[in-house]
Every structure is written in structure tokens, then in C-alpha cells.
């Protein structure tokens, strides 16, 4: 059974696992300042990080949650996923491998 590369239907695993994974990655990039602050606090605090890093943890959670709840952000990530899936269905090469196999000139 050949799959239509441009088909827009999403399977359960795509909606509930793969697209949220892209959302997490992109949200972490966009909240990089809060991620860095929280990471630094945890490294500096050691065992007491649970108590000492509450402010940084709250700021990070607020930033990430704002993206997770944004319907436009979900649509952006969904379209990115559909584009990658379409490319995979046309070429048979996963995105990560395609990016790794780019020729380098020296």
C-alpha cells in the first residue's frame, strides 16, 4: 500500500507523541534563558535545588506552558511534522539521516 506523501491525516501516535515532542524541543529553544537559569541554579545548589530553585523552576514552567497551550504554536509544530513526514514518504530517508549525509567540501 503506497502512502500519499501529501496526505494530512494524523495517526494517534503522531498527535499524542511525535508532535508534542517537536513542541517540547521548540519550546525549550524559545525558553532557553529560563532553561539556562534553572540549570545554573541546580548546578550551584546541589542537593538543596528543590528548595532553592523554586523561582527558576516556576519561570521555566510558565514559559513552557505558555507555548504548550498556544494553538498557533501547536499548528506550527504540526505543519513542521507534516512537512518532514511528506519528505520522508517521498525520499524514504529520515530527516536526521538526510541532514547527516550532506556532503562537506574542504
Swiss-Prot record:
Keywords: Acetylation, Copper, Disulfide bond, Metal-binding, Mitochondrion. GO terms for molecular function: metal ion binding. A motif (Cx9C motif 1) lies at residues 31-41. Residues 28-71 form the CHCH domain. Signal peptide: none annotated. The keyword Cell membrane does not apply. Disulfide bonds join 31-63, 41-53. PROSITE patterns: CHCH. InterPro entries: Cyt_c_biogenesis_Cmc1-like. It holds the Pfam family Cmc1. Component of the MITRAC (mitochondrial translation regulation assembly intermediate of cytochrome c oxidase complex) complex, the core components of this complex being COA3/MITRAC12 and COX14. Belongs to the CMC family. PANTHER family: COX ASSEMBLY MITOCHONDRIAL PROTEIN, COX ASSEMBLY MITOCHONDRIAL PROTEIN HOMOLOG. This is COX assembly mitochondrial protein homolog. It comes from Bos taurus.
Amino acid at each position: 500500500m503506497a502512502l500519499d506523501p501529501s496526505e494530512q491525516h494524523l495517526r494517534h501516535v503522531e498527535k499524542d507523541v511525535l508532535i508534542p515532542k517537536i513542541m517540547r524541543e521548540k519550546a525549550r529553544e524559545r525558553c532557553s534563558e529560563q532553561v539556562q537559569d534553572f540549570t545554573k541554579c541546580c548546578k550551584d545548589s546541589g542537593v538543596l535545588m528543590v528548595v532553592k530553585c523554586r523561582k527558576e523552576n516556576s519561570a521555566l514552567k510558565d514559559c513552557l506552558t505558555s507555548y504548550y497551550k498556544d494553538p498557533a504554536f501547536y499548528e506550527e509544530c504540526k505543519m513542521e511534522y507534516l512537512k518532514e513526514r511528506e519528505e520522508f514518504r517521498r525520499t524514504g530517508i529520515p530527516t536526521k539521516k538526510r541532514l547527516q549525509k550532506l556532503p562537506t567540501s574542504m
